[in-house]
Amino acid sequence: MIKLILASKSKVRKEILDKNNIISEVEPSNVDEDIIKKSLIKEKASPKAISKNLAELKANKVSKKKNENLVLGADSVIDLNGELISKPKDRKEALEILKKLNGKKHNLISSVCISINGAMVWNYTDTAILTMKDISEEGLKEYLSKISDEALYAYNVYQIEGDGRNLFLHIEGDEDTIMRLPIKKIKEYLNNYK
């Protein structure tokens, strides 16, 4: 059976791999995402390109150390009318992000990349479109009070498979993309890998 190395410390992504019977070990890339995002934004890269570049960079970095192993890098970004929304650093920032998204449509872009020996061999990027309900500030605070710090940072503000679903009026796109790991596409690649 193929073993996959996850270039991330995301417990959520690891759990998804485990639930899908994909043998994996964790080796965080420790890539400084903020510096890379700022550089790519300066170069006028699209949110989709930023997500794809980060996933590839993470996979390539770890795969250079883990020769002959398949390494999975992943990244997700929120695009609000061209503005890149990053993970919150604390609950105050999480509230500000939710207020920004409140009553609006945004794109959630998820990218995955598999690399071997420091070179990408496969990648996939998908976009889901989410329309958030118009919720009072008190309602947003109540939502934030219900989720753990770990969930808050792991899911980039909203935990769609939990109470986060109630924040949205309309969700268009693949559930795997929204969960930030397009697992069906990863399994397709692994099943065809020789």
Where are these regions (language model features)?
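Active-site oxyanion/phosphate-handling segment shared across diverse enzymes
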Residues: 123-194
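Structural motif
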Residues: 3, 69-70, 106-107, 111, ...
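Generic enzyme active-site microenvironment
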Residues: 73
